[in-house]
Amino acid sequence: MSMKISEKKFNDRVGDGIQDSFMRGAVSSAQTRLYTNRLKAADELGNWEEWRELGEQIRQHTLENLDYYLMQLSENVSKRGGHVYFAKTKEEAAKYIQDVAKKKQAKKVVKSKSMVTEEISMNHALEEIGCEVLESDLGEYILQVDNDPPSHIIAPALHKNRTQIRDVFKEKLGYENSDDPYEMTKFVRKQLREKFMDAEIGVTGCNFAVANTGSLCLVTNEGNADLVMSIPKTQIAVMGMERMVPTMEELDVLVGLLCRSAVGQKLTSYVTVAGPIQEEEVDGPEEFHLVVVDNGRSQILGSEFRSVLQCIRCAACVNVCPVYRHVGGHSYGSIYSGPIGAVLTPLLGGYDDYKELPYASSLCGACTEACPVKIPLHDLLLKHRQVIVEQEGRAPLAEKLAMKMFSMGASSAALYKMGSKMAPAAMSPFTSGNRVSKGVGPLKNWTDIREFPAPSKERFRDWYKDHKKGGDK
């Protein structure tokens, strides 16, 4: 899988999402639950806004000194016996991982949940050279078995119910029991444990890398990442270049913000800090590789969108977004969905495929208020719109013509008066009572789902003139 998860046009993807009543119900329920849990966890911590400000300061400081901390990380990982590779592009990252697998003559690779490995199409790259890649996160495993893309940053299978999951397991894996979550989890655990023992390589993502120790931090709910890091003889960790913290002190702050913002817990079930195995340690990989991925991030770092790199992938913005609630994650056409996806995806994937995403927002600002590191997401969405219109010249032709006509009419009293007199007659074929019930062209996007007020037959100036004279209108 790559960052792009669908070849459908944006409007078609949105239409599919709106018509999927189960998905909308599941998203609504999950958003409400996660939002409530997040508020409770924040209240328990106390001084939540001060913690947000501290998180923002840590992320901003790290980005301002990213070159220094990356070099420090590289030196410390190397001192501990690990190998570090800086990949400028996603192709370079995938090629390096392929080369490691070839060198090890690996046939089976087990991995934990990682957005950046999806971004670089790692699974596909390994499958090209004959490796079997197994997802160990339960949600990702369900999607892998069903060949279905993720719809949420932290809950990838959110759009499926347990009956659908049972049917997938029955059809693809020969599962014969009920749709009880415990029974299905037990079944998957048995499937995965057998594969863990046979895997030559384990691949993980990285929530945060600690510069001054050369350590990596992984946060999971299932403990699968611990097995991925400890059982296979070779471990490959893949991280976006921005996922840095200077020391363990900053890590402590950001992990607390991440867990509370993502799932409303003080800590998730497993927070693991690890790296290359040391002499005194009894388990862990014999060989460790860290792949640091740029893939456009250095350009973002030097742009007006820099603050998006503060993201800690908690999905708090997704969990409060009213647009995501109604259209779901697949509508974004990217592994990165919700407000953060609408900002980040066009920067990584370009406007040609993702120019609609910055407009998939009501600009209500709920995402900005929810972000634990205070990324001004709704402002960044507006900046995207400005770039699309002014720098790229990508405003739709119909919109350009409409704005040009409005500009001409609004700047001429005579044209404005003539237009206001003609409007009622021009719209009468589409009017029922005092509402526009159907539209043509761009108006259909509005009138197909809501009523539009019909133009008044009486101009305001005429009404005001009569009212001022004491008329009874």
Swiss-Prot record:
SUPFAM superfamilies: alpha-helical ferredoxin, NagB/RpiA/CoA transferase-like. GO terms for biological process: lactate catabolic process. Keywords: 4Fe-4S, Electron transport, Iron, Iron-sulfur, Metal-binding, Repeat, Transport. [4Fe-4S] cluster 2 binds at residues 321, 364, 367. [4Fe-4S] cluster 1 binds at residues 311, 314, 317, 371. GO terms for molecular function: 4 iron, 4 sulfur cluster binding; L-lactate dehydrogenase activity; metal ion binding. The keyword Electron transport applies. InterPro entries: 4Fe4S_Fe-S-bd (IPR017896), 4Fe4S_Fe_S_CS (IPR017900), FTHF_cligase-like_sf (IPR024185), Helical_ferredxn (IPR009051), LUD_dom (IPR003741), LutB (IPR022825), LutB/LldF (IPR004452), LutB_C (IPR024569). Residues 302-332, 351-380 form the 4Fe-4S ferredoxin-type domain. Pfam families: Fer4_8 (PF13183), LUD_dom (PF02589), LutB_C (PF11870). The keyword Iron applies. Transmembrane segments: none annotated. Is involved in L-lactate degradation and allows cells to grow with lactate as the sole carbon source. Has probably a role as an electron transporter during oxidation of L-lactate. Belongs to the LutB/YkgF family. This is Lactate utilization protein B. It comes from Bacillus cereus (strain ATCC 14579 / DSM 31 / CCUG 7414 / JCM 2152 / NBRC 15305 / NCIMB 9373 / NCTC 2599 / NRRL B-3711). The gene is lutB.
